[in-house]
Swiss-Prot record:
It is found in: Secreted. Expressed by the venom secretory cell of the spine. The spine is a cuticular structure containing a single large nucleated venom-secreting cell at its base. It is an independent unit capable of producing, storing and injecting venom. On the back of D.vulnerans caterpillars, spines are grouped together by 50 to 100 to form scoli, of which there are eight in D.vulnerans. Peptide that induces pain in mammals and has insecticidal, antibacterial and antiparasitic activities. Induces partially reversible paralysis in D.melanogaster when tested at high doses. Shows a moderate antiparasitic activity against the major pathogenic nematode of ruminants (H.contortus, EC(50)=30.5 uM). Has potent or moderate antibacterial activities against A.baumannii (MIC<0.25 ug/mL) and S.aureus (MIC=16 ug/mL). Has no activity on the other bacteria tested, nor on the fungus C.albicans. Keywords: Antibiotic, Antimicrobial, Secreted, Signal, Toxin. One of its GO terms (biological process) is defense response to bacterium. Residues 1-24 form the signal peptide. This is DELTA-limacoditoxin(2)-Dv11. Transmembrane segments: none annotated. Its main location: secreted. GO terms for cellular component: extracellular region. Belongs to the limacoditoxin-2 (cecropin-like) family.
Length: 57
């Protein structure tokens, strides 16, 4: 359970870094909004997954 959360966090950080490197200050606000939207969706699905398999710990 902890490993999954750590992996997800690492993945999000790497994704943000790669996006920031690829888009230097061009449309940054719009980009951030898009990232937050995707991030919320990912977090929601991750919560569902961890919720359904939470009894295994």
């Amino acid at each position: 359970m902890k490993f999954a959360k750590t992996f997800l966090l690492l993945f999000v950080v790497l994704l943000l870094l790669s996006i920031v490197m690829a888009e230097p200050k061009r449309g940054f606000g719009k980009l951030l909004r898009k990232v937050f939207k995707v991030g919320r969706r990912v977090a929601g699905s991750a919560a569902e997954i961890s919720g359904s398999s939470g009894g295994e710990e």
